[in-house]
């Protein structure tokens, strides 16, 4: 039996390494066709992004592609770019904030299979969705956290806002955060410049009506104003008709809720990566959720087959070169007579 096996192997070897390489390449390709996989854990992400659509987000002190745009437009462009940085299998939902609460527009869906739907929903979010001039950011953030906590997969919250409270927030009468800080992870993303600018006034159809004047807005919290009223309070006092990024206020809210804060900087041109770190923030390892997955290993036997075929080709070239050298030596050793 052993002698027969040895004889079989000897006959196979006598066929030459050329056929061995070809057979091994065919075997490797056959393995690749079996779709081999291995169990791994993939870091995936699950977010709900809430966009502030109140009137101060229409101030054009943001930049996209080197051009001034409204704060909301910069936020939308940065998010549109960041969608491409989330790995397939991750989920993202969209919401908006207006008046004093957040609203869920689209529950988290898988980003690759639903990229067009996410971008279409994002494209339809604009300032016309704000049905009131109020902008109670702290309450909106707290309700956004409640939404994220109530969703089945407990996504992280990304709350995008300029932090402009209208009417102004008095620390003595401000809302209290009743949840456990850090129960919902995520980011507060600040949008806007640091120089106060007039807030555009628009009608329900989004048409411009000029800018808000000092005598058209509240410059103090109504409850505090009524308690501390003086004869001069009837006159406009303050600059609440102007808006800038309220970074200090947003940092306080982040500390209170256990979220992180980042400022949205210049966004790259459409189609490119955001100039800010929004994409990196959405894919921060601390927000990743290891999910069991199967890694495709077809590339390994396919690569092996390619290398075997390349080795066979090189072997044939070497054999051909050897034959040519032998023929040349034979011709030199036996010259024909003239």
Which positions does each model-derived feature cover?
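DG-centered beta-turn motif at the end of beta-strands
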Residues: 29, 52-54, 75, 94, ...
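VWA/integrin I-like adhesion module and closely mimicked acidic/polar interface patches used
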Residues: 163-248
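Short beta-strand-loop
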Residues: 90-124, 147-148, 274
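C-terminal signal-anchor/stop-transfer transmembrane helix together with its immediate cytosolic
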Residues: 2-43, 280-338
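Second-shell loop/turn segments in exported
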Residues: 61-72, 81, 104-108, 125-134, ...
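Alpha-helical transmembrane signal-anchor/signal-peptide segments
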Residues: 38-55
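Juxtamembrane amphipathic/hinge helix adjacent to a transmembrane helix
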Residues: 46-50, 255-298
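…and closely analogous acidic/polar surface helices at protein-protein or active-site interfaces
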Residues: 44-45, 57-91, 110-114
